Amino acid sequence: MGNDERKRPTKKMKYGGKDDQKMKNIQNVEDYYDDADEDSRDGEGEEKRRDFTDLELKPDHGNRPLWACADGKIFLETFSPLYKQAYDFLIAIAEPVCRPESMHEYNLTPHSLYAAVSVGLETETIISVLNKLSKTKLPGEIIDFIHASTANYGKVKLVLKKNRYFIESPFPEVLKRLLSDDVINRARFTSEPYYGGDGFTIGKTSGELEAGPGELLNEAELAAAAEEKETHSFEIDPALVENVKQRCLPNALNYPMLEEYDFRNDNVNPDLDMELKPHAQPRPYQEKSLSKMFGNGRARSGIIVLPCGAGKSLVGVSAAARIKKSCLCLATNAVSVDQWAYQFKLWSTIKDDQICRFTSDSKERFRGNAGVVVTTYNMIAFGGKRSEEAEKIIEEMRNREWGLLLMDEVHVVPAHMFRKVISITKSHCKLGLTATLVREDEKITDLNFLIGPKLYEANWLDLVKGGFIANVQCAEVWCPMTKEFFAEYLKKENSKKKQALYVMNPNKFRACEFLIRFHEQQRGDKIIVFADNLFALTEYAMKLRKPMIYGATSHIERTKILEAFKTSKTVNTVFLSKVGDNSIDIPEANVIIQISSHAGSRRQEAQRLGRILRAKGKLEDRMAGGKEEYNAFFYSLVSTDTQEMYYSTKRQQFLIDQGYSFKVITSLPPPDAGSSLGYHSQEEQLSLLGKVLNAGDDMVGLEQLEEDTDGKALKTRRSMGSMSAMSGANGRVYMEYNSGRQKSGNQSKKPKDPTKRHNIFKKRYV
């Protein structure tokens, strides 16, 4: 699903494209791609896979926009007159790998083709359009791979009825095949009435139409077919739904489950009186993303990927307004809960008593039978003891059939803690929103069965050219380590303080201070300074006398600081820890200075860039400025000759794949800055070095955030320094205890038989 997914067709095919009859007997699409999940851009055999000299060019290849290779790679020319149509098609059937300005690279994968057929594209339509756009004759390997990946889609549905999950299919033989799998068989409930001859529940369902070749690029919504079909189904355990969906994916049984919600014909769940306001006008790319979600009068579960600042909130509110059923909206923290509640009221006609917040500080309920609840992932997934009021609210959430489960920053869902949310709540349709569909633990592909396929992904550079998001100048500022700091950095005994040493590098501090002064005084910009290292965050903020927000900052104080940053002319810089990475809306900010980060996290780099991607000024002014008119700036300060250089290169990879480039700056601060900046003298630098070395290891590490549990604010694991901590005896006391277990009653442990003791100790017990 994400950029990390590299499975694709190879030339080791079991049969040629002519043997179409065998296609009907395909059970496992794994036969069509290598078992190894390697990156095709590296490794052995690269030259062999890259040799496409046998591809046959079409006579009019100059008029066609893309190259389709036998290994599943597709290259798109962005300067082609057909670029826009080709991009809309490719983003529906393939995974983007790298999208610089002139040439895009995509991969055909089983999951991308699963997503394609889920939005209504037929197998033959995919092959036909891909062949029309390709400069070469479409390789037989790709044709076979498309057939294998899409052959079984739509044969199995996952349906929610009265808080019970059913696997439904018009083909009883398919259900038998699924039940032959141990995982699915163990998940089956056998208490259903009205069995057919095969032991399945028999019912009726309305049919549907699929998109044809002529309707592919027009995105026209098709009407639902009126024909009714006989369906067979069996019930499964709600706690095992995740396992069942995973087993049905293309890399397993290859019967990907169709999750669609026929909300217009749902007469069981009450309707929510909610419409979009007249001023809520979705942009073209927002409309396109919604058209991928809605078709045939039904809502599909899946993921929409839009850059930060591109209007994901409006997409989410629009989806909820179109379904008009109860909606559960999940965010990452209490600040974003407030922002989502505000967005619902801003863009829709929902009444104040129909929307409520559920956080550790605010436990509200909506009035009536239907409404919107905005809460955090932690509040739902928390497994500890709750207050009586919170327990009642959670129980209501568990028992309710939600029309829409709206998940912001959906890339966090694969985490063990957050994925429990999917099984705790029951919803007909799931929509995930994110800007960065990447994770360093390779769990991003789990979203295929936790949520659904990727429905749409926007191209960042296209939105920049359209003036929909800011045009950002990215720069990496190289800060040489001072002699004293570098000497301590190289010492083995300081291994736990290496990060603190290169973050607190005096030259990095001076560069940071210079950039803040330049952008505040000469440009009048609003600046965010990011630091994962809590020790550095505190030292920088106190030295420069700027407000800061970190894990232990109360919700009230956070709100006050952010409000002052947005409205006050005197508060132009704010320091943020990693709590500011996600879901904090600061549209006024247009400069980011990053002084420390979380190792090589590509997602964090993109999320932080997203804090300044909100479009600035009027659309006409942005368009008139041209692509070279930068209106936002992203600085990553790196201490040279340290581990930070390696991490910085890795972190930038996602943004480079989106078409961004990083300018390297080696002369900050300028030589004439002199003593006007802090830590100019060697005495000041040595004093700072002593402070870093004398701090405890727990004080100079990364900020560790606790779970946002019920009744407890988001806090950090931090303690005040003391002499006992310096000696290594912090929190330790002397006490005696009896390690032997006492038996029930007054009987004590019987003494050991002296004859069974070791010879050395026998004489002591004579």
From Swiss-Prot:
It is found in: Nucleus. Residues 31-41 have a biased composition (Acidic residues). The keyword Manganese does not apply. The keyword Lyase does not apply. PROSITE patterns: HELICASE_ATP_BIND_1 (PS51192), HELICASE_CTER (PS51194). Residues 510-676 form the Helicase C-terminal domain. Induction: Higher transcription in light than in dark. A motif (Nuclear localization signal) lies at residues 749-765. One of its GO terms (cellular component) is nucleus. Keywords: ATP-binding, DNA damage, DNA repair, DNA-binding, Helicase, Hydrolase, Isomerase, Nucleotide-binding, Nucleus, Transcription, Transcription regulation. A motif (DEVH box) lies at residues 408-411. Residues 757-766 have a biased composition (Basic residues). ATP binds at residues 306-313. GO terms for biological process: nucleotide-excision repair; response to UV-B; transcription initiation at RNA polymerase II promoter. It catalyses: Couples ATP hydrolysis with the unwinding of duplex DNA by translocating in the 3'-5' direction; ATP + H2O = ADP + phosphate + H(+). PANTHER family: GENERAL TRANSCRIPTION AND DNA REPAIR FACTOR IIH HELICASE SUBUNIT XPB, RAD25/XP-B DNA REPAIR HELICASE. NCBIfam families: rad25. ATP-dependent 3'-5' DNA helicase/translocase; binds dsDNA rather than ssDNA, unzipping it in a translocase rather than classical helicase activity. Component of the general transcription and DNA repair factor IIH (TFIIH) core complex. When complexed to CDK-activating kinase (CAK), involved in RNA transcription by RNA polymerase II. The ATPase activity of XPB/ERCC3, but not its helicase activity, is required for DNA opening; it may wrap around the damaged DNA wedging it open, causing localized melting and twisting that allows XPD/ERCC2 helicase to anchor. This is General transcription and DNA repair factor IIH helicase/translocase subunit XPB2. It comes from Arabidopsis thaliana (Mouse-ear cress).
